[in-house]
Amino acid sequence: MSRNSEKQGSMLHRFQQQQANAAGLLDVGRTVRPTYISGVESLPQAEKWRSQVMKEISRKVTKIQDPALSDFQLRDLNDEINKLMSERHRWDLQIRSLGGPNYASFGGKKRGYQYYGRARELPGVSEMLQSQKKDDTKKSGDFYIPPKNLNMVYFGYADDNVTGLMEFEKQRESELQDMLAGKPDEDSGFVVGDITVPEEGDLEARLLEERKRRVQALLD
């Protein structure tokens, strides 16, 4: 009797897994995150993987503030954050190509290797950053901003540090799960099988407006 129950449970698990795969869902906790990002053709999966990357970034950005870390540990951790930021950007592009939100519109314009948290205090790094800021000021003609007034927006990290934006992404993830489960969306009034897709321009306008509001809130 016990063996029959185990067999039935196994069959049910396989059936549920097949349904999840067909719907584009997967258990990210048990699956290795793909390195070939452009090969992920399911929007829900891409959003799930991006969410996992965002959580890793958040944990490491918090950890890099730890005053107990050595210079060696800070450099290693900063390298890891930069790699995750690069991966996050590739997921942004893939999600956009699959018809999802344009997350890249929330990001800063800075590209390349960046320093976070206490890594900015490493020997040689602080001097280099000060020199870069002075060069940028001369090129742009803008006034110099004292270090005490700098924030995460300046360093191109506002999209991952703004609480409101994180809530927006959580809401987006919840909406996707409801759509795949066939749960009606009270705000939009649609269910799976009768989906009204917003115009691309409307979605971009909404995301741009959200970005402006969040950045302005930080600067006020």
Curated annotation (Swiss-Prot):
GO terms for molecular function: first spliceosomal transesterification activity. It is found in: Cytoplasm; Nucleus. GO terms for biological process: generation of catalytic spliceosome for second transesterification step; mRNA 3'-splice site recognition; mRNA cis splicing, via spliceosome. One of its GO terms (cellular component) is post-spliceosomal complex. Keywords: Cytoplasm, mRNA processing, mRNA splicing, Nucleus, Spliceosome. InterPro entries: Helix_hairpin_bin_sf, Isy1, Isy1_sf. Gene3D superfamilies: Helix hairpin bin. Belongs to the ISY1 family. Involved in pre-mRNA splicing. Associated with the spliceosome. This is Pre-mRNA-splicing factor ISY1. It comes from Yarrowia lipolytica (strain CLIB 122 / E 150) (Yeast).
